[in-house]
């Protein structure tokens, strides 16, 4: 990620085609040593591509990754209709408890790092 960030920083700073030397200079400025193999891989993958298009594609891919922020929020207790009763509220609490347990097992966001 540090190589991609450095590449983007150089590209957004006006360097349309950052070299390994440019990226190493950025990384050295914050005390990070560069791995030449990874650095060359990032440069070869991003060389000649429009950075804005790459960012847009990345945002599209991230949109499909579950973030856990879409949890349903129940209405305030006083605003519920009187006919609703307490049975649906109890069912919601049970669902929320089950959901919390399953979220712990999904810490890898749907994909494993070492698969």
Swiss-Prot record:
Function, as annotated, reads:
Plays an important role in the elongation step of protein synthesis.
**Name the UniProt record assigns to this protein:** Large ribosomal subunit protein P2
Task: Quote the CDD domains the UniProt record gives.
Answer: Ribosomal_P2 (cd05833)
Modification N-acetylmethionine, positions: 1
| Any GO BP | cytoplasmic translational elongation
A Pfam family assignment: Ribosomal_60s
Task: Cite the record's Basic and acidic residues compositional bias ranges.
Answer: 91-101
Q: Which UniProt keywords apply?
A: Acetylation, Phosphoprotein, Ribonucleoprotein, Ribosomal protein
Q: How does it assemble?
A: Heterodimer with RPLP1 at the lateral ribosomal stalk of the large ribosomal subunit.
GO molecular function terms attached to this record: structural constituent of ribosome
* HAMAP family named in the record: Ribosomal_L12_arch (MF_01478)
What residue spans carry the region label Disordered? Answer: 76-115
Q: Which family does it belong to?
A: Belongs to the eukaryotic ribosomal protein P1/P2 family.
At which residues is Phosphoserine found?
17, 19, 79, 86, 102, 105
Q: What are the N6-succinyllysine sites (modified residues) in this protein? A: 21
Cellular component GO terms, alphabetical:
cytosolic large ribosomal subunit
The gene is: RPLP2
Q: Name positions with the PTM N6-acetyllysine.
A: 21
Q: Where is the composition biased (Low complexity)?
A: 76-90
